[in-house]
Amino acid sequence: MNGDQKLDAYAQERQDFIQHFSQIVKVLTEEDIGHPEIGDAITRLKEVLEYNAIGGKYNRGLTVVITFRELVEPGKQDPDSLQRALTVGWCVELLQAFFLVSDDIMDSSLTRRGQTCWYQKPGIGLDAINDAFLLESSIYRLLKLYCREQPYYLDLIELFLQSSYQTEIGQTLDLITAPQGNVDLGRFTEKRYKSIVKYKTAFYSFYLPVAAAMYMAGIDGEKEHAHAKKILLEMGEFFQIQDDYLDLFGDPSMTGKIGTDIQDNKCSWLVVQCLQRASPEQRQILQENYGQKEAEKVARVKALYEEMNLSAVYMQYEEDSYNHIMGLIEQYAAPLPPAIFLGLAQKIYKRKK
């Protein structure tokens, strides 16, 4: 396949994936929406699904489907197994939605995917906490409905539970490293940053979708999973660093969100890099302005980052990281097709959103 054909194939996969969402909503709501006792709650679930699971890039969910297609020989890709792969892909997207709805409340965010955060909508507020729980429990309802008879059912349940736990541990590290109103720059070390990123982002964004497809393709060996994890966690680290960079230097019309890392006192890659390079005077500027809500203080931190040319530091890091990941793919991809990892790398490097 040449580049254009690959793009067309990907666009088709994406379209099929998005079209499957109506079936997901139907399966989760159709039976009980007219129920005399819980019908109203199911109407709310439908609304929650339709507002929060849609509008992203669908990279995580699509990764399940694309990896499944790469791993399973065409003759065994019958309509039922493809339906299951699409559904498990949507389970990953629902996990993402569960995290994002919760995360936006914790970070006091305003927009997500180019629209108002769910909890910010009139009449929603902190009821969004329970809505997030609904998104999470929908995952296990779908897995039961579609995969209960499959030999990999338990592997998938354990994988989703483990990924949720790891992400929640990462979020805990993130929150305790950046308590609101208590700026302690000494906490922002490279070591702590890497731990946050590995647990909060890399497991569920990169390992989970590939591992899910591996289990569905009958690949359950520890060695194969450990090797895939080695590559995917590194990719996840790069992806989060890129996200931190785009939080401040990205274009909100592209990213769909307005970054809040500076005012939220976050242990971001940019602040870690700044601290590694700062003179005592520059550190003082950071101390006085970081983690504060005032627009002029946020602007002062951004000006400091620009003064220290952190954009150039990032560009160099992106280059080095890409080369490092290519080396890992060469070393650890087999027996899986390298195309799985190369396709993911292609999607994330040089992205703008």
UniProtKB/Swiss-Prot annotation:
It comes from Bos taurus. It is found in: Cytoplasm. Dimethylallyl diphosphate binds at R112, K200, T201, Q240, K257, K266. One of its GO terms (biological process) is farnesyl diphosphate biosynthetic process. PANTHER family: FARNESYL PYROPHOSPHATE SYNTHASE, FARNESYL-PYROPHOSPHATE SYNTHETASE. Pathway: Isoprenoid biosynthesis; farnesyl diphosphate biosynthesis; farnesyl diphosphate from geranyl diphosphate and isopentenyl diphosphate: step 1/1; Isoprenoid biosynthesis; geranyl diphosphate biosynthesis; geranyl diphosphate from dimethylallyl diphosphate and isopentenyl diphosphate: step 1/1. The gene is FDPS. The modification N6-(2-hydroxyisobutyryl)lysine is found at K57. It comes from the Eukaryota. Isopentenyl diphosphate binds at K57, R60, Q96, R113. One of its GO terms (molecular function) is metal ion binding. The record marks F98, F99 as: Important for determining product chain length. This is Farnesyl pyrophosphate synthase. Mg(2+) 2 binds at D103, D107. CDD domains: Trans_IPPS_HT. The modification N6-acetyllysine is found at K57. Inactivated by interferon-induced RSAD2. This inactivation may result of disruption of lipid rafts at the plasma membrane, and thus have an antiviral effect since many enveloped viruses need lipid rafts to bud efficiently out of the cell.
